[in-house]
Every structure is written in C-alpha cells, then in structure tokens.
Amino acid sequence: MLSSNTRGDCSDTAEEMTVDSRDSKDLSAQDIGEQKQQQMEDQLEDQLNDSRDPQNNNNNIDDDADEDAEFEEPEKANPQQDQDLGETEMEQEHDLQQEDLQQELPANSPSTPPRSPSSPQLIPKLEQPATPPSEPEASPCPSPSPCPTPKYPKVRLNALLASDPALKPDAKELTLPDSRLLAPPPLVKPDTQAQPEVAEPLLKPARFMCLPCGIAFSSPSTLEAHQAYYCSHRIKDTDEAGSDKSGAGGSGATAGDAAGLTGGSTEPPAKMARTGKQYGCTQCSYSADKKVSLNRHMRMHQTSPAAPTLAGLPSLLQNGIAPPGVTPNPMEDSSSQQTDRYCSHCDIRFNNIKTYRAHKQHYCSSRRPEGQLTPKPDASPGAGSGPGSAGGSIGVSAQAATPGKLSPQARNKTPTPAMVAVAAAAAAAAASLQATPHSHPPFLALPTHPIIIVPCSLIRAASFIPGPLPTPNSGIVNPETTCFTVDNGTIKPLATALVGATLEPERPSAPSSAAEATEAKSSPPEPKRKEAGLTRESAPLDLSLRRSPITLNSLSLRQRQLRNALLDVEEVLLAGVGTGKENVETPRGGGSVTPEQIVCAPSLPSSPSMSPSPKRRAISPRSSGAGSASSMSPPGLNVAVPHLLDMRSMLPADFGLSESLLAKTNPELALKLAAAAAAAAVAGSSGAAAFPPASLPAQTSSGNPGSGGSAGGAQQPQIYVKKGVSKCMECNIVFCKYENYLAHKQHYCSARSQEGASEVDVKSAVSPSIAGAGGLGAGAAEAASSVETTPVAYQQLICAACGIKYTSLDNLRAHQNYYCPKGGAVAAPAATPTDPGQLGMPKEKCGKCKTLHEIGLPCPPPVANPLAAPTVNPQPATNSLNKCPVCGVVSPTAALAKKHMEMHGTVKAYRCSICQYKGNTLRGMRTHIRTHFDKKTSDVNEELYMTCIFEEDASALSQELVTPTGASTTTGHDSMDHPSQMFNCDYCNYVSTYKGNVLRHMKLMHPHVAINSPSISPDTRDQDVTSNPTTNQHSNSDVSNGEAPSFHIKSEPLDPPPTVNLVHENNNSPIATPHIKAEPIEVGADAAPGGLVPPMTSPLGNSSSVAAAAAAAAEVMKKYCSTCDISFNYVKTYLAHKQFYCKNKPIRPEASDSPSPNHLGGGVAVGLGIGGLVGGHGQQKNKENLQEAAI
C-alpha cells in the first residue's frame, strides 16, 4: 500500500509541476486546452489514489514537519535573492524540487515508510515562493478530494505573477507554515526502521550524486548516463544480473520494490528507482525521466495528448499504472515498433527510422562482424546458464510474453517471433549436445563454394521466398545457383553452387566412415562463419596472414571457383591430419564444437598464408600448398579437373617432405613447386614446354600454356629458381658450388675487408653434385621428385624480367604484379644453352677476360662488332640498361643501380676499355661509351666496354708505375687491364688510344723526322710492346688468349687540303679545314729517351730547312698551353685561354707566349742538327703532318 500511495503522490506532484511549468511560459490557445484536459485526467487519478488510502495524510505528518524544517531556510531566502529572476528560473526551481521528491519517495518508501509525505502536504511546500495567503488552508485539510479543486487557478495565477514585487510580503508570510507542526501524531514504527533517518539528512543535498565517484549532477538522466557508461566504479555484471532477473521473471515485483530488494548499498536502489520512472511518448520511442521534458517533446508532434491508448501502454506500465483488459499481442506490436528504432548492439534509441537505418548501415558496431538488420536476441542471459541450458527457450518466451516487467532497455531488446524461433532451435540443439555429449547433431552440407554447413535444426525456422530476388549485381554468372545474404538491407551473393561433375574428385579423397565425414565437416571454422552471415568481403582483416597476390585477370570466375572449391575440400581433409589448429576444438577429443568457438576462429579460408613463418607452417598444412593451385598452376589445369586431379598428390603436406632440406627451410616453396609440377603432369603437357628449366610461369594472363607450350610461357613473367648449397648473406647471392662460394668470399665479397676468408659457413656446405640440378629439372615429373629428394639448403627466386633476387615467393609475386618495370609488357625469354649470360645460371667474374660467365668454361670470344652484337644475342639490350659490371645484377633504375654498387665497396672507379677514360659514375660511363659509336642506337651494350677499378688494383698500380725509363704515370695507368686498340709512336714508347694524340706527340717531340701515320696494327703494337719491357708488363694482362678485340670506332676527318700551309702570317685568317676539338696531348717524357733520339752529330746543314722547321715548331708551341695540355688553332684563342680559363693565370699572358723550356729544349736541340738528316721530300711531308697534328 505504501508503494502504491507513493506512486500516487509522485504522480500528483508531477502533475502539479507540469501545470507550473506550462503556466510559466507563453502558451497558445491550443496549449491551454491541453492543460485543461491534462488537469482533468490528473484530478481523476488523484481522486482514485486518495480514495484508496484516506489515512495517508495522518501517517507521515511528523516526517513532513522535519522536511519542512529543512526546506525552511532556503525558502526564506528565495524571495530576497530571486526578486529579479524571470520565469525560467522559477521553472527550473520547481523542476529541481520535483525531481528531488521523486528521487526520495520511491527510494525510501520500502525501508522507511513514515518518510513518504502525502500529496496535500507536498503541494504548498513546492509552490511556497509563489503561493497566496490562502494556500495554508489546503495543508491541514483532512479530506483529499476538495484539495485539488481550488489549487489549480491559484497556482496558475501565482506562476504568472511570480515577478510582481507587490506579492513579496505575502510570500514572506507564507514561508512560515508553523501550523503544520501541530498535525496529528504520526504512525509509530519500530526503531530499526528509524535508525537510517539519522544518516538521511546528510545525503539529501546530493540527490543526483554518484556516491562512488562523488560527482553531483543536475538531472537524474545525466546521472544515469554517467553510471551506465562513464562511472569508473560501475559493475557490468551487476547490471546484467539485474536485467536477467527482470527478464526471467525472478523478482516479479515492480521497479520500486526492486529497489528495496536489491538494497545493501544506497547506489543500486537509486539506479533501479530511476530506471523505472520513465515517461514514454505514445507516438514514438522517445522517453524521459521528467514529465516536463515529455510535454515539451509532445509539442513536436503538434497533436494534443490523447487518452491512454494501446500504443501508450508501455509508458503506463512504467509509471506503475495497470490498465485493465490488455492483451499481450498489442504489447508485442508496440515493443516491435520500438525495436525497429533501437540498436541493441550500440544501446542507442533513435527518433527517426532514417537515422536508425543510416546508423545500421554506416556506424553500427555490428556491421562488420555480423551485419544483421535486427537486434541480437538476448535470450541466453535470461536463462542464466549460457546458451547450452535447457531453459534458454523458456526465458526467451517469457521475455517475449511479458515485456512490461522488463526495464526499458531490456524491453526494447525483445526479439521478434522469428528471432525467438531461431534462438529456440539453437537452444534445443545445444541442449541435445549437452544431453548426449558424444553424439553429434546432424548437419546439412550445401554443395556450394564455399561449402555452407547448416544444422538441421535451423531448417524449422526457414521460410519460402518465391520468385527472383531483386539484386543489383548484374555480374553474377548463374543467379539461379547462387546463395545470397542480406547485409544492411542489400542482397549480396554468398556462395555459388558447384557443378555436378566437379564433385566427383572429392569422393575418393573423402573419409570412408560416416563418423570421419561428420568430423571433417564440423571441424573447419568456415561453415559456421558463413552461417552467421559473414561473407568474405565483410570479414575483418586478419593481420596474422598475408593474402596471396591478386590475379583477378588471370582466370575466369568459374575456374577460380572450381579450384578454390577443391582446395576448401582438401582443407577439410587435412584438418584431421594437422595438429595444433588455432581456436578450433575437434570433436575427436569428445568435446562439442560450440558456435562461439567456431565463430572466433581466426583463420580465413580465402587467404592462404604466404609468409614463411614456421608457426603458420606447423599449424596449417594448407598454409603453403592451398594457394599453390590458384597462383602457380596453369589455367589449362581446369580442363582435366573432374577426372584427373587428386589434391593429395598435388599437395604433399609436411609429412611428405620430411627428408628434404627444402621442406625444412622453406616448405612453402617446395609445396608450390610440387603443386605446379604435378599440375603440369596432370594437364598432359611436357615439362620442357610448360615449365622451362629453372623457371615458373606466373598466372597473370588467361592463356593456356598446356596447349600454347613455350609460346604461352613467353607472354608471362617468369621466375628463375636458383638453388644452391651456400649463400653469401652480405651480397645476397646463392652459389651452386661451395668452391664458388669460397672464391667469392675471398676475392669478391663486399664484406671481405671486415671478415676473413676462414669465417665461412661450413655447415651450409652440402655435396655440390647433388645441388647441380639447379631448377625443376627437364620434366615436370622429375621436378616433383627432385623437390623431395634434392637436399638444397638455399634457394633464390629471380625475376626473369629485371633480374632482382628474392628469398620469398610472395615478395617476388608482388614485385612482378606491381613494381616490375618489364614484367607487364615484355617477358624475359626462357633460359637456353645459346644464351650464356642468362641470369638463371650461376656466373662469376672471370679474372682473365673480366666478363661474367660460368666458372670452368672457356672464356667467350670477344665481340668483333658491337653493332652486330644484338643479332647474335637475342636478349633485348634494355635488360642490361643498369647492369652491374661487377656481379651482373640488373637494376630497374639508375638510382637502384647506384645503391647496388655501394655494396661493392672496393669499386673505386670505372674505365672505358676503348679510350681508357676513367669515370666515377655508371651513368657517366654509359654516356661516354656511346660517344665512341657513329649511331646513337639502343643496341649498344655499354657493359662490354666498361671495367671496374678496384682498391687492390690501385695499390698494385702504384707499385708497377715506378719504371727506370721515366715513362709517364698516366701512360702506364691507362694501358692497364684493358684489351683495347692502341696507337704507338714509331720512335719512342709513347702509346695512346687517340690517333691525334700520337700525331701531336710526334710533331712536338720528333719534328726532325718525316711524320707518318702511327702504328695501329696489332702486329706493330706487339713489336713495340716487345721492345719495351715496361709496357709489356701492363699489356700482358690486357690481351687474353693472344687476342685483341677490334672495335668499330668513328674516325676523325684528318685529311686537310694539301695547298694550305699551317703557318700564316695573319693569324686572323681562317683555315680551310674542319674545326674539330683538339684532344689533350699525352707527353710520354719530358725529354726523349737516349737511344731513340738521333744524336746531334751534324752542325748546321741546310740553313733554310732548319729555319723553316724552327719557325714551324715555334709557331705551334706559341699556341700550346703546357699547363692545361691544350693546343689552339689561333693565338687569340690561346691568349683568351691563358687570361681567363687557364689553371695558372699569370698577370701578363704575353710572358707565356714563348714555348716552355722543358718542352722546347728537346725540339731546339733537335732542330740545330736536323739539316743533315732530312731532305727536301722529308720537309714537304713534315709540313703535311704538322698541319694534321695541329688539326
């Protein structure tokens, strides 16, 4: 009775406050009509509640006196402080007092009944600052029925005149209701109930305070939100337990009684009391804890509040009013309406159905894992024992039948009848699993890809949908055999039915017994994920796996489906063999596979692992081999799928490769190679045609290599598998022979300066004869056997297009699919015996010929004509665009080539083998080498004419350059290590690769002789080399096997007109010869060596000849800069050079016009005795050669 009276008092107070809040605003005529109608309804409710308890006023008068004493001081101060306050502040004060009373009464009514005041006593206290002097007459009124009648007009009048200063004295007189202290004595209660009253006044000022946190709030809704979401002391289990009790019907009491039953601490009763006082809108799902807020909300609908209808029954049930004659079906309808706009996953209520749909489509937390359009059925918590309890369906049915006894959130989560049926079927299946733990429920395996396994119990709740489905996906091949799923209102394809012929290969490999078949079907995690509505596109990303390279354009949709279906079936079969499957509990141990365990399995069937992680290899045998057919096998394989494929032979799991070192180091590659070889053998194509030696075609086109042979392989980027017994970790090179590895570590490794040659990987040395196969073999069948028997320790995967090496297959696939500059357009040809420079073969740099070829083979003959080289070598010249001259690695860009050359730390410079030009960059050397050829063609392979200068070569050079003959350091350095065509001086040991330099040298150093063309034939050069031991020392290393390569080098136009003399009186007169840039003069020695210069035995012979020769020599030397080693055609050009550009710019350029004594001494001395040796014919020839040298 006390609880019902308390509800009546709270509703009276709430209705009075509603009137005050309405009258405190400017109301229209329609609002006034609403007020009158609401007042009439409240009067009827008050009369009914007061007639039930006529003694309510006499029970709690003493307690009301105490409360009045507490409120007395603030009420005295209010008229003075709030003199200038507007109507809004009055309304806020009324609302605050109303909320305080609503908070106190339901919480204290079960424990302390005398503290619940009656409605006639609360009315003047709440309206005390604005009540007229006649208000105290209503407080001692014993009969409750006449009290509300004169109350409303006075309240309305005082609310409008609250700011009138003329009524302040009256308001002060009314703040002293001393007469109420003389009310009849209250009902005496035991002392045990009066003890909590001592602590109550301390808690009253913080009526909206979170006790654990100590934070006060201005409204109970804010406090409730804080306690539900933000409070650090909230206990989720307690809240769920409270909702479970209310859902299962365990407490059978109302919200007010539940607050008293769960007492023990003061916080839970406050929460339960607030959750029960919700004012719900009759036209939408809006609810508020204050009726004032609900009235404001009702104005949005622009309709007057009608009488309580069936749609308003939930709000009446929350307020404690029991409407008569209510059937449960309309209640379910109203709850389903609220469920349509309530998201149970996020616990958010929406006012608009459009907002709700937008939330479910874009923002809901369930769209990724489940994507359901309806809320989750909370049936299992109601049973209290999990999903496997037998009472799950009972709890669901009770929850659906009595939504009025639930809290608002629990009531809004009430499932629909279809959801109840599905949950009941699932609970029945779980109960049957618990009843018979060793017997498994029957499942239905649908012949789709992926295979969908559905429990038979779910068929009971299935419904029939006639006609075609309105799907926007027009790209579906066979819509009549496609399974769909509804995801956020859109229909998406889930699985596709398999063709009947493709199901035949699965039967021989399936287990024979029915128990093993049931175990294989229920073990994989895939079917339950499909049952829960998870598609492959909406599944969360599993970062523990790496997806296989995307080859959407390689195969058609049907071919991929057939292949993946076979792989999925193979995964089911191999699941019983492999142990340690993550998060999957197989029924072999006696346990049951619950839906929770299956859903939480992390592995994705559509993304086989491509990483060489040992953990993934040990967990799943399919992690390496499952994706091999889709990424490695040829497309023509699907032609013979129905009757030829046996997946177990195509996927020899870890137990089949236990003896192989390849399986131990990288079983992923072994499985892929074995799968590709077996696929080629099944397809009926020869291994040499479909799989070239040491190469694997990638599936990037929809061609048929089984029928096309090598022609189809030429259109696809290939992979060269280089396998060996040793690997240099610093240079990332795999060696087929251990001897080559030792030679590399001793002579060529970039880390040989830090590590000694003895620190080698001895444990990696396996028999070189076994590792000599180096690939898949000649045929595919031999390749499959070699994968299992060849004990190779290392393998490298080389991109055939650009030559970059990789140790992981997925990295190589990603490179070929996205980054390879030549993989998309032009594929590299297969390795043939006629191509010795193919990257698939192990090559080393030969110390004799300085070229890359296989160790043990004779040095290749030099190319006679570089322009004809492309006709001999079918390999495109673009493959060697950035080829490393040291190790032969081809880089796609110049920047990568430069970075690669940094690995070879001992390479100091590069030298042109044609002219001995030395450069520091590869790009500059390639540009320089192209200047030697007439045509600027792209067929020139610059690496053939480029050699490297190593650090040890420079140190050896410094020792060899000390010669007793005084030869030039530049000459000795230039002629080292390079097989090139040289031009020799006939009278000394001067050698140069430019003919003009030799002519200039002969003119300057030997002007006494008739200057002929220098010796350019190899025979003449060999004689000169033999006559000079110092030059022979360097040139022996240049010529390999007694052969000197000949080059087609562009010739300079050196034939001048014979009638033009070199020396002119007027230096400004033009010379009728082509202007060609003069080459630097390489002076062999400051003075001609003794024995080669003719002795000056004759005095002045022919004075005219001597004078002419001396004048010519002086004229030539007048235009020669010895500092920069440049000769000029004109004196003015020479003077400008000396003044502005010379390294040694003197103050007076004229002082340097005379020839240098060092260079002229020999010439003058020779000129003094030249008359007796040279005749008239020699003088004429000398002039022509001087003119040629000057040019």
UniProtKB/Swiss-Prot annotation:
PANTHER family referenced in this protein's UniProt entry, alphabetically: FRIEND OF GATA2-RELATED (PTHR12958), ZINC FINGER PROTEIN USH (PTHR12958:SF3)
UniProt similarity note: Belongs to the FOG (Friend of GATA) family.
Modified residues (Phosphoserine): S116, S118, S1013, S1015, S1017, S1156
Sites where the protein binds Zn(2+) 1: C210, C213, H226, C231
Name used for this protein in its record: Zinc finger protein ush
Free-text domain note: The CCHC FOG-type zinc fingers 1, 4 and 5 directly bind to GATA-type zinc fingers. The Tyr residue adjacent to the last Cys of the CCHC FOG-type zinc finger is essential for the interaction with GATA-type zinc fingers.
Composition bias, Pro residues: 130-151
InterPro entries tied to this protein: FOG, ZF_CCHC_FOG, Znf_C2H2_sf, Znf_C2H2_type
Superkingdom, natural source: Eukaryota
UniProt feature, compositional bias: Gly residues: 383-394
Region described as Disordered: spans on this chain: 1-153, 169-194, 239-274, 304-338, 361-413, 504-540, 601-635, 1011-1073
Zinc finger extent (CCHC FOG-type): 202-235, 335-368, 720-753, 791-824, 1113-1146
Compositional bias annotation for Basic and acidic residues: 19-28
